[in-house]
Every structure is written in structure tokens, then in C-alpha cells.
């Protein structure tokens, strides 16, 4: 993970740690002219590592976004932001996207009253995301919510009730709330 964030910059979904600035000798050696290919590859890798996708999954999302009407890049980011694991991360119910994936895989999360164990589940507007009524599930989420530093900067397409361990998807995300800087 640290090699990835050192090479690509801060990836908030992958880890909460930040790369050190200026002290990296390798970056000074690699600071030549960047080709278009290198820029596109780095941006693609940022997407992959931030959202925790394989190459094949990313290609499927690009294909779906290409078929839809509108800007392919904006639609791609909207599709990725509406994944269940990413929404849990944005709500503050998990500290990272891999942590959110683990919560979903271990069946701690309900969407509209049903257990969902697929992290790539695409959430829709008016979906209600809750935890299981088990004590262990609620304790896990409570620890994440209590320790999450970005409670006040919740995107406007999401609302959370931290006392009932419940989140609500209000609408599809706006482009200004997407947390990753992509060229």
C-alpha cells in the first residue's frame, strides 16, 4: 500500500496515511517529462487502487459508462461512487474501502432490510443501509463512526443516523463530491 501511495499520491479509500512530501529521492529521479500514456496509466491505476477494483471490473464499468448517455468519465465516477463498499466508507461506517468490503463480506450490512454480501452492489437512491441487529455488528460500526474524522464533511447525497447505525442514499452523487482527484 505504501509503495502505491508514494507512487500515485494520496488515496483516501485505500489507507488513511499520506505520502511524505519532498523527501522522496526516487521521485526526484523520475521527474522527467511525463508522456500522455504515463499520465493516463497513472490515473487509471489511481481509480483501481482507490476503489479496490481488478482490471476486469474496471473495464466492465468503463463499458457500462460508455453505453450510457452523458460524459463517460462522470458516469464512470458515479457508478464507482454508488458501490456499497464506497458508500459505507463515505458514511464513515468504515475507515477504508477494504475495511468496508470486509464488513459487507462478513454479512454485517443490510440494504433495505436484506443481507447483502456483495461489495460491488450498486446502491440506488432511497436505499436504506443498516447493520445487523447483532451486538458484534453494531460494536464494529460504532467504533468506526466514533473514530471517523470526516463526520462533518458528509456528501450531500448521503445522510446518516449514527445512533441507529443507519445510512440513507438520497440521490446519485454530484461530481463535486467525488473525493478522488482525477485528470
Swiss-Prot record:
Gene Ontology terms for molecular function: rRNA binding; structural constituent of ribosome
Domain of life the protein comes from: Eukaryota
InterPro entries reported for this sequence: Ribosomal_uS4, Ribosomal_uS4_bac-type, Ribosomal_uS4_CS, Ribosomal_uS4_N, S4_RNA-bd, S4_RNA-bd_sf
Residues annotated as domain S4 RNA-binding: 82-143
Gene3D superfamilies membership: Ribosomal Protein S4 Delta 41, Chain A, domain 1, RNA-binding S4 domain
GO cellular component: chloroplast; small ribosomal subunit
Compartments reported by the entry: Plastid, Chloroplast
Record carries keyword RNA-binding: yes
First and last residue of the signal peptide: none
Any Pfam family: Ribosomal_S4
Keyword Ion transport appears in the UniProt entry: no
GO biological process terms on file: ribosomal small subunit biogenesis; translation
Record keywords: Chloroplast, Plastid, Ribonucleoprotein, Ribosomal protein, RNA-binding, rRNA-binding
Self-association state and partner proteins as the record states: Part of the 30S ribosomal subunit. Contacts protein S5. The interaction surface between S4 and S5 is involved in control of translational fidelity.
Role according to the record: One of the primary rRNA binding proteins, it binds directly to 16S rRNA where it nucleates assembly of the body of the 30S subunit.
Alphabetized NCBIfam families for the sequence: PRK05327.1 (NF003717), rpsD_bact (TIGR01017)
Stated family: Belongs to the universal ribosomal protein uS4 family.
Protein name: Small ribosomal subunit protein uS4c
Amino acid at each position: 500500500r505504501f509503495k502505491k501511495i508514494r507512487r500515485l499520491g494520496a488515496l483516501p479509500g485505500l489507507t488513511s496515511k499520506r505520502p511524505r512530501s519532498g523527501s522522496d529521492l526516487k521521485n526526484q529521479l523520475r521527474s522527467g517529462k511525463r508522456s500522455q500514456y504515463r499520465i493516463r496509466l497513472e490515473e487509471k491505476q489511481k481509480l483501481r487502487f482507490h476503489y479496490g477494483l481488478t482490471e476486469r471490473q474496471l473495464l466492465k464499468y468503463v463499458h457500462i459508462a460508455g453505453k450510457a448517455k452523458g460524459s463517460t468519465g462522470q458516469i464512470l465516477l458515479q457508478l464507482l461512487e454508488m458501490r456499497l463498499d464506497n458508500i459505507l466508507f463515505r458514511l464513515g461506517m468504515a475507515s477504508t474501502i477494504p475495511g468496508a468490503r470486509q464488513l459487507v463480506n462478513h454479512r454485517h450490512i443490510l440494504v433495505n432490510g436484506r443481507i447483502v454480501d456483495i461489495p460491488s452492489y450498486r446502491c440506488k437512491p432511497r436505499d436504506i443501509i443498516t447493520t445487523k441487529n447483532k451486538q458484534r455488528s453494531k460494536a464494529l460500526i460504532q467504533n468506526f463512526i466514533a473514530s471517523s474524522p470526516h463526520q462533518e464533511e458528509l456528501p450531500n447525497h448521503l445522510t446518516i443516523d449514527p445512533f441507529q447505525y443507519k445510512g440513507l442514499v438520497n440521490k446519485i452523487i454530484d461530481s463535486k463530491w467525488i473525493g478522488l482527484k482525477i485528470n
